Amino acid sequence: MDFERIAERIVDFIREQVEAANAEGVVLGLSGGIDSAVVAFLCVRALGREKVLATIMPEKGVTAEEDVADAIEIAKMLGIEYRVIEISDIVKMLTEKLGKANKSAEINLKPRVRMMINYYYANGLNRLVAGTGNKSEISIGYFTKYGDGGVDFQPIGDLYKTEIFQFAKFLGVPEKIIRKKPTAGLFVGQTDEGEIGMSYAELDEILKMIEKGIKRDDEKFRRVLKLVNGSEHKRRLPPIPKVRDLI
């Protein structure tokens, strides 16, 4: 991997997105994990620290204190403005108002609350929301529709998770963040690889095979292929029926 050229291309892309929208910078959710750290580093490189706002949005009793501390450390390291917004009261207010739902609906409400907060600041500051999704997550739909998937652009969306680990080292992301077990932080004890049912190394190997049109006859391959096909709707704009020929 030519890390310098990859960084340059992504940096140019970020600048182009912001300029095309006549925006004045970006807002991004900083979780204390590797993906958001990498995006923060790239946004600062592209726009300068004064044009990057980080939102740190923990949930009481769920988000690890270490993750909040690491997110703040990254923000201070880069010299960017950050806001810590604890989301528990917002989530509680919504669930009480809306009534009891199933576990999936309640869990997915959290990233949707975070999305609303990001756009609240982005709208107020004339900025875009930078996403932090990687190619592995996007490919299998491992994100919440109109939650963490609700962004204006995805700077690292063409890099697999295993490539992000290498890229982060090149950018200078602290080693302790690179070594962390990846987690969406939606419930206590949650890990990405535990939910996906395989390591990112295994997942990325299969995704690269699918991308090249190579097939494999085993349970993990079939599971990943099912996830890719079943999440296609998450990667597209809402479908529209064609009626112009009837008018």
Where are these regions (language model features)?
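Conserved G/P- and acidic residue-centered "switch" motifs that form tight phosphate/ATP-binding loops
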Residues: 33
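Conserved beta-strand segments that form the floor/walls of ligand-binding pockets within enzyme
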Residues: 29
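ATP/NTP-dependent adenylation/nucleotidyl-transfer catalytic domains that generate, transfer
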Residues: 1-26, 42-45, 50-53, 60-109, ...
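Catalytic nucleophile loop
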Residues: 36
